[in-house]
A protein has these predicted regions:
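Divalent-cation
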Residues: 1-91
Length: 91
């Protein structure tokens, strides 16, 4: 039986500190709902991508994403830039 609980993962990318985006939060069920609520409170763009969140959820907290995930995460960062008109690490 497939687990139908909501899942969420959050990334942070600080170019001056990180060589790649990092997982800063992940969870299922109530924890996922809290992650999404906090993101909404802070006007952080949300993207619904169940396959990507599944892969990100397998990573350890604060782990940088592996190189084979760069393309998928670059698409997320491009989405965030389009929504916020702000490039990560810029003022």
């Amino acid at each position: 039986m497939k687990d139908e609980r909501k899942k969420a993962a959050a990334l942070r990318y600080t170019p001056e500190k990180d060589t790649a985006p990092r997982i800063v939060a992940k969870g299922t069920g109530i924890i996922a709902e809290k992650i999404l609520a906090i993101a909404k409170e802070h006007n952080i763009p949300l993207r619904d991508d169940p396959q990507l969140v599944e892969v990100l959820s397998a990573l350890d907290l604060y782990q940088e994403i592996p190189p084979d995930m760069y393309k998928a995460v670059a698409e997320v960062l491009a989405f965030v830039y389009k929504m916020t008109k702000k490039i990560p690490g810029s003022s």
